[in-house]
Amino acid sequence: TLMRKTVALLISFLCCFSLAAQDLYEQYIATYSDAAVAEMYRSGVPASITLAQGLLESGMGRSTLAVQANNHFGIKCHGWTGMKVYHDDDAKDECFRKYESVEDSYKDHSDFLRYKDRYKFLFDLEPTDYKGWCYGLKSAGYATDPSYANKLINIIEKYRLYEFDRPQ
């Protein structure tokens, strides 16, 4: 019947769409995992946290900020003296940091967490305590979304990003 064909087509479409989204996540991870691990060794920020935040904040590297400003973490200007871009976020025309490369964004994200007083307590956690880091980022005010920590945890667990936190 027409109804069965429509339902079958819809299910096929949803499966393909889901697989395509999963492929985008995996593509992002494959592209930036080395940078995240390098930052973990340099700064102490777990690679799982960097990757999960990068995935979430940049829409898998496809957000306007990621594409136009190489800003994969949604970091705003606040005292920034480098290049800037203006983008609507919580308010209209907010100032965001702009980077020469995605790797510069990753480095600045690590330094942002490492040297801002409100995040210092995170570095007392074990690097493998990704849940502690996620809840800590939320409690320190990294994002306004009440589900932020859980979203990060879901990404980390679904894509096994915690495996990047273990010394090789």
Segments the model singles out, each with a brief description of its role:
Residues 19-168:
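Catalytic cores of secreted/periplasmic lytic hydrolases that degrade extracellular macromolecules
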